[in-house]
């Protein structure tokens, strides 16, 4: 970075001889979006095309404008999508792993971008999960991707649900099933883990109420905010 905090971008000199380059952008914060924009702008100025590997789609959970009791929350994914569309003449393709929402992909395509989606079943390490008895989706939003893995493993699927507690307004995770899960091996599947609240709550329910034997988890994208790497072992 420069002394004022601006991002410094350096591209190799021999890039001028390229007709098309591959870009892998693992974006973890807003500065990554800005850095990608700078690179795309330079490539466009030089007339160089690119294939963009974007494993995690930034702002994908902020895909709707919202009005709360205290503020407005903008559709920040729309802003990011429009940034990418500014460079659609040089972006030959965008490859994304297990996107959070199909609507996000539809928007990118509507803006003239070609998107290659890698499904969760294409990255799932099948050999690592051969002794699973049940697969659980932590909510309705994860049902489709969880169903894909359940089909791969040929095991039953259970879908939990989230409800807002009217007393404290907090989101609570509920698992209602009459299945006997005692001493069973459970696999939880989701696309994103951030603070880990859903995983923590589901694990607690499975251990305390259903006496399961073992809980495994497969997540496509690990955000792991708030130092979650250190807190997950003690919480589960």
What are these model-derived regions, one by one?
Residues 1-236:
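PRPP-associated nucleotide enzymes
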């Amino acid at each position: 970075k420069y002394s004022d905090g601006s991002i410094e971008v350096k591209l190799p000199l021999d890039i001028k001889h390229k007709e098309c380059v591959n870009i892998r952008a693992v974006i973890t914060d807003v500065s990554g979006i800005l850095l990608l924009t700078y690179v795309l702008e330079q490539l466009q100025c030089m007339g160089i095309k690119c294939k963009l590997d974007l494993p995690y789609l930034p702002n994908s959970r902020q895909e709707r404008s919202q009005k709360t009791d205290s503020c407005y929350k903008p559709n920040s994914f729309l802003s990011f999508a429009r940034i990418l569309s500014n460079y659609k003449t040089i972006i030959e393709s965008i490859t994304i792993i297990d996107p959070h929402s199909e609507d996000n992909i539809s928007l990118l395509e509507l803006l003239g971008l070609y998107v290659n989606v890698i499904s969760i079943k294409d990255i799932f390490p099948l050999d690592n999960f051969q002794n699973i008895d049940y697969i659980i989706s932590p909510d309705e939003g994860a049902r489709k991707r969880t169903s894909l893995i359940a089909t791969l493993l040929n095991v039953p699927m259970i879908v939990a649900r989230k409800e807002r507690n009217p007393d404290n307004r907090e989101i609570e995770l509920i698992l209602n099933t009459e299945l006997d899960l005692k001493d069973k091996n459970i696999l939880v599947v989701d696309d994103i883990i951030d603070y880990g609240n859903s995983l923590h709550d589901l694990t607690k329910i499975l251990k305390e109420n259903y006496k399961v034997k073992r809980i495994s988890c497969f997540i496509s994208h690990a955000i792991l905010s708030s130092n979650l790497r250190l807190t997950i072992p003690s919480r589960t």
